């Protein structure tokens, strides 16, 4: 049986609302396929610290949020640009989170 998933656009709009409720500035920086585009979340912690999160499958075939790039913002932007070159349906959500409050789907991302 296939996994039930929310449409990408719906999930992103929910994340924007959650960020707004928690006073975290957030913006959809890149729009992809409304139904099934992959989502990258760029979390900007400071001028020198940034992470990119993506959903991946773990060893138990469960989807988990994973840090796929980290470092200064330009390194994270380069990772996103490479992903966008191969995936035109890619979405990018950017969040300013200096206190490290953001948790996608309420879970701590894996490193």
What are these regions (language model features)?
Residues 1-111:
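Polybasic/polar functional segments that serve as interface/processing modules
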């Amino acid at each position: 049986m296939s996994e039930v998933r929310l449409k990408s656009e719906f999930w992103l709009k929910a994340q924007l609302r959650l960020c707004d409720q928690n006073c975290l500035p957030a913006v959809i920086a890149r729009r992809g396929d409304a139904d099934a585009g992959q989502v990258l979340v760029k979390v900007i912690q400071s001028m020198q610290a940034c992470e990119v999160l993506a959903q991946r499958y773990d060893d138990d075939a469960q989807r988990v949020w994973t840090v796929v790039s980290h470092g200064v913002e330009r390194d994270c932007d380069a990772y996103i640009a490479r992903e966008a070159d191969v995936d035109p349906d890619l979405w990018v959500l950017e969040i300013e989170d200096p206190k490290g409050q953001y948790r996608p789907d309420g879970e701590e991302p894996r490193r």
